[in-house]
């Protein structure tokens, strides 16, 4: 059994399988983060949104992504990652990323008053942002370990390219999901929350693949 594990760990195809498991959570993270960027015009007329947010509200919500990161969250969590390893800490923060996205989706779907939904969504965005950034560090560290001495730069480049494709996908398909209406027509929550629901579903797939990665690494180690 130990010989089989060593053979798989040294097999270059195992490395690419690991990469395949790692890139999906990052793709999903970038997609969810940018899902409203091409829909920002909607917030210019909050009176036509059941959500009720204006441009300032949307800007406030989006700023939540960086709040915990710039106040030492990345440093503290990076130290925890060094201390306890990718499998434990990375899993916690992938979970935090998905949980934060779930809280955002709940906030913009439940029919709260605008200020209440904004507050809940902001908290969710803070958790999502910190989870996403530490998950990204975990992915980079895992790639460095698995591709040590072989195709490391290529693997990191592919990971980043696929993650950025999440941004491009969000920008391209969000206007198709929430179709623009004539000025004066009303947008319901069921319409404006569609990008978040899709993003949350992709994040859930990413979390499952992260779990596959953790299980595989645990077995091979």
Language model segments and positions:
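Cytoplasmic helix-loop-helix junction between adjacent transmembrane helices
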Residues: 124-161
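C-terminal ends and interior cores of transmembrane alpha-helices
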Residues: 95-114
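Symmetry-related core transmembrane helices of the 12-TM Major Facilitator Superfamily/SLC fold
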Residues: 193-214
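Central cavity-lining transmembrane alpha-helices of secondary-active solute carriers
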Residues: 63-79
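Extracytoplasmic
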Residues: 17-45, 53-55
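Glycine-rich segments within core transmembrane alpha-helices of 12-TM secondary carriers
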Residues: 153-179
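Small-residue-rich segments within alpha-helical transmembrane domains of MFS-like 12-TM solute carriers
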Residues: 30, 34, 129-137, 168
């Amino acid at each position: 059994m130990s010989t089989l594990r060593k053979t798989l760990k040294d097999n270059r195809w195992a490395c690419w399988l690991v990469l395949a498991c790692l890139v999906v959570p990052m793709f999903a993270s970038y997609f969810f983060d940018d899902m409203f960027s091409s829909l920002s015009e909607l917030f210019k007329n909050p009176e036509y949104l059941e959500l009720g947010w204006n441009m300032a509200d949307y800007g406030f919500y989006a700023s939540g992504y960086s709040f915990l990161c710039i106040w030492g969250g990345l440093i503290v969590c990076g130290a925890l990652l060094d201390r306890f390893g990718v499998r434990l800490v990375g899993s916690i923060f992938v979970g935090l990323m998905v949980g934060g996205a779930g809280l955002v989706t709940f906030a913009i779907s439940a029919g709260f008053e605008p200020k209440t939904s904004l507050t809940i969504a902001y908290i969710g965005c803070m958790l999502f942002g910190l989870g996403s950034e530490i998950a990204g560090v975990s992915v980079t560290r895992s790639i460095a370990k698995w591709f040590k001495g072989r195709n490391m730069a290529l693997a990191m480049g592919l990971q980043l390219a696929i993650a950025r494709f999440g941004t491009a996908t969000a920008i391209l398909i969000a206007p198709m999901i929430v179709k623009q209406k004539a000025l004066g027509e009303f947008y319901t929550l069921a319409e404006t929350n569609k990008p978040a629901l899709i993003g949350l579903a992709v994040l859930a797939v990413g979390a499952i693949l992260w779990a596959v990665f953790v299980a595989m690494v645990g077995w091979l180690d």
